[in-house]
Amino acid sequence: MNIVVVGLSHKTAPVEIREKLSIQEAKMDEAIAHLKSYPHVEEVAVISTCNRLEIYAVVQETEQGVREICQFLAETGQLQLNRLRRYLFTLLHQDAIRHLLRVAAGLESLVLGEGQILAQVKAAHKLGQQHKGLGRLLDRMFKRAITAGKRVRSETNIGTGAVSISSAAVELAQMKVKDLSNQKIAIIGAGKMSRLLVQHLVSKGAEDITIVNRSERGARDLAKKFPDVDLQLELLPEMLNVVEQADIVFTSTGATEPILDRAKLENLDLHTLILIDISVPLNVAADVEEIAGVRLYNVDALKEVVAQNQASRRKMAEEAEALLEEEVENYIQWWQSLETVPTISSLRSKVESIREQELEKALSRLGAEFEEKHQEVIETLTRGIVNKILHDPMVQLRAQQDIEARRVCLQSLQMLFNLETEEAI
């Protein structure tokens, strides 16, 4: 079995491609079932965020498994595989393990060290378990990645002062208008990203904020989190009226198609309007920029803001790298030790069978008058002897770091004791 990751990210693909390959949580069960239906895919987990879609898998044959995952991605994005391939990356074995740990630690994020990705890795692990995508290898790997992500944030300073996508979006708005306090601001959507937008806007002095949401309940739930802020609440049918009055509009919804485009905006009485779309799939169609006075920015435009933050964080990232290597090594040692399990189990089973047979012979010779408590003593004695004899060889076998040396030992045990073993994971 081999571990692979195939995917794309903000480093390899523009948002116009990433939005085509975004998998909503409601569709994750179908995606995992589809991937598991391929003949060479044994385990699977999916991380889907605004900046990445990554398929982690345990495959029987690396080349065939990777080909099947690429086919799935092409079908999901409704793209020709030849066109899609230039945006994909593939990592195998140790590199795939290291990549997941780097993702969980925030080292692969657009915003170096951002904390939201760890929650997204946890969610991917939970969904993988829930939809029966995970087996022994990926379950352990994701748990190790989550542990590594927590360690990086608690044992290094990489998370200190890190900007998020939401805070970067607010920084971008401030760069464009200087003073947010005199701007009419609208946020379309009332999810977690919108909550963070409100938080950062208020901290930057914004006073006139309107929340537009599909459901009144969602908007009210968001407003309750900011009891000291006078948030205006509107429902989706009022969206265009709100946009017409706004100076800056942030969009952050789960819509799979654009909710704003040129056709909807061109007849509005707009003077100047800044649209900042932090959703993937995109909420705002690119053709709105054909309207005079409208400026559109999507998540890829945030790199301008992030660049100011990155240089000071590089040194912190180096500290995190060393810590992650420890976690990678721990996982690899565990994975390699699985190779010994069938042989050890077979040896213990064979020795235990011999012990039981010989004990039964001895007790039958001693006769029925032999007291039960004495039988228990002999039972305990023989088990103890077996455990003592097997303990050191098993410990040494598991601890052997040299792969070839370990395989020679395994083959020797199998030959000397005539063991029948099942194939290891």
Swiss-Prot record:
Similarity annotation: Belongs to the glutamyl-tRNA reductase family.
Additional notes on this entry: During catalysis, the active site Cys acts as a nucleophile attacking the alpha-carbonyl group of tRNA-bound glutamate with the formation of a thioester intermediate between enzyme and glutamate, and the concomitant release of tRNA(Glu). The thioester intermediate is finally reduced by direct hydride transfer from NADPH, to form the product GSA.
EC category: oxidoreductase
Keyword tags: Chlorophyll biosynthesis, NADP, Oxidoreductase, Porphyrin biosynthesis
Pathway involvement of the protein, from the record: Porphyrin-containing compound metabolism; protoporphyrin-IX biosynthesis; 5-aminolevulinate from L-glutamyl-tRNA(Glu): step 1/2; Porphyrin-containing compound metabolism; chlorophyll biosynthesis
Residues that hold substrate according to the record: 49-52, 109, 114-116, 120
UniProt protein name: Glutamyl-tRNA reductase
GO biological process: chlorophyll biosynthetic process; protoporphyrinogen IX biosynthetic process
